[in-house]
Regions:
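The feature marks the mature, well-folded catalytic cores of soluble enzymes
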Residues: 2-128
Length: 128
């Protein structure tokens, strides 16, 4: 995301607290190119359970690498009776499922939000 911060008061920005209302949960679906490759089937079972639980209460945004992975995840979630009406898939390239580290950082800006984007290097390529 590219945006200008000129003429903006940085003191108006803040991190939302973990307990504040949220619109959705954001996850990246594991695939063979992620750090879960050796345990992919086991990890997918956990993601399916997570997806079914989250969609009982709110929306879920799932990042997938391509259309084939989206179809695969959709089938698994559907079989687990996740509410697919609350799921949004976004296709993007990624090699790390830990979106807390590599995903967007959300800031409150008055009544709105800003997303910060940065280049995550896996702690200087420690695991690359």
């Amino acid at each position: 995301m590219r945006t200008s911060h000129r003429n903006h008061d940085p003191m108006s920005l803040r991190f939302p607290a973990e307990w504040e209302p949220q619109d959705a949960v954001l996850v990246a679906w594991p695939h063979a190119g992620t750090d879960w490759a050796e345990r992919l089937a086991d990890v997918e079972t956990t993601y399916v359970a997570l997806g079914a639980a989250v969609t009982r209460f709110q929306r879920l945004v799932i990042v997938v690498a391509d259309a084939a992975l989206e179809a695969h995840a959709r089938a698994l979630l559907g079989a687990a009776r996740a509410d697919l009406g609350r799921v949004r898939f976004v296709q993007a390239a990624y090699d790390d499922t830990w979106l807390r580290d590599s995903g967007p950082i959300t800031l409150r800006d008055g009544d709105g939000f800003r997303l910060l984007d940065f280049r995550f290097t896996g702690w200087g390529g420690k695991y690359g």
